[in-house]
Amino acid sequence: MKKFLFISAATLCISFPTFAGDYLTNTNQNAAFLRMIARGASIDIDGVYSNPAGLSFLSHEGFYLSLTGQSAYQTREIDANFPLFKQADGTNSSRLYKGTASAPFIPSFQGLYKKDNWVISASFAITGGGGKASFSNGLPMFDALAMGMITKQTDGQVTPQMYDINTSMDGKQYIYGVQLGLSYKINDWLSVFAGGRMNYFTGGYEGYLKTELKNDYTQIGQMMGLPDGKTLASIDLDCKQTGWGITPIIGADLKFNKLNIGLKYEFKANLNLENITEKMDLINVDRKYLADYEDGVNTPSDIPSMFSAAIGYEILPTLRASVEYHFFDDKHAGMANVTLPDGTSVAKQKTLKHGTHEYLAGMEWDITKRLTVSSGFQKTNYGLSNDFQTDTSFSCDSYSLGFGARVNLTQAWSIDVAYFWTHYNKYTKETDSYNGTGLKGSDIYNRTNKVFGLSLNYKF
């Protein structure tokens, strides 16, 4: 019986790395992006990230500085349907699991110095992740695996209503990016850029799993040989991760009177995350099943290459519009391995149908010399598959809306303020062996997202 406990408890844990190993590339590094979204052809201070080659076309020589603060809030929902949930709850076979991810303050800084045809620029930002996600009531994969394995190994004699499963998991991830580069205006219509970004990852996950017989059934636990008569399995884990990598960046900007074209390519950054395991307390669990969480173990988590192309056009002296395209080559960025339904193990990126495509558009209007209003739209398609999606790491195709304003306080000082909202398309994953239990089940994944941003800009 104890052998069964080892196997089931280990199965519950093998998906933990996918939570910390997956991340988002943050393109919102300035409130100007939040209020207009399509900023890849902008010639402004936020171009340090969105269009660095275009900085050479800035009219003012000297220093430009921008300090940004953003506040982001997300929810993640899993509507799980599994037949054993009905036995445990006595109601129906579905359960709703909800997690929250918040980042009250996401800072970023952008600065540059322009002299003649040359511009040197630098930035600091949280270029990936940026918050903490908490699932206080655990995840369906943990509950379903425990129920399925216990039912199978005891031939149904130990049923879900005889024990409690308590799980909780917190995960956090931050990728701090420091960027430095040079822009040069070759002639009146062409400028180029070369630079790089140093990425430092820090994050990890902390959680526990406890499966215990209820008080009315402790006698059964004693017959099973459980030390305290009730604990089937227990895991208490605290694992931190760190890693770093370099992203080379090149860009070009082509300016033809009212038309401007911005191009940028960010190369893949090879990133390996190293475990710093501070706690691994186990009861009825063989340590070898948690070998991936031992101190010093490395997991691939590359930052994918990215290509952006944008076209901006000045319709009127006071009205401008832009369209933009992004491609993230996720299929060639190393990720942790996942186990397929047939039992084989493959690198997670290979399960994607294609890399990420993003389509962006935006407009801004100078109502007066002091006030500019703007809005934008973004559509994101990830190329998701059932094998890529897990409870601990899932994404949903989406569209986003942003709007806001710039207030020119003086010739030197200005403020950008914006709100950014995302609608996600629900993703339904159905399987004949729900989380390896041999029973049919399904998950419906959904998310929400909203971001507030404020940037203070200064030039001299």
Tell me the role of every PLM-derived stretch.
Residues T11-L12, G90, D253:
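Short stretches within intrinsically disordered, low-complexity N-terminal or propeptide regions
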Residues S15-F16, Y64, K210, Y382:
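Residues in and immediately flanking transmembrane alpha helices
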Residues F16-I126, F394, F420:
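N-terminal, post-signal peptide beta-strand-biased segments of exported outer-membrane/organellar beta-barrel
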Residues F4-I14:
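Sec-dependent N-terminal signal peptides
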Residues G21-A38, I43, I106-S108, L112-F460:
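Outer-membrane beta-barrel porins/channels
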Residues T11-L12, H60, R197, H326:
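Hydrophobic alpha-helical membrane-insertion segments
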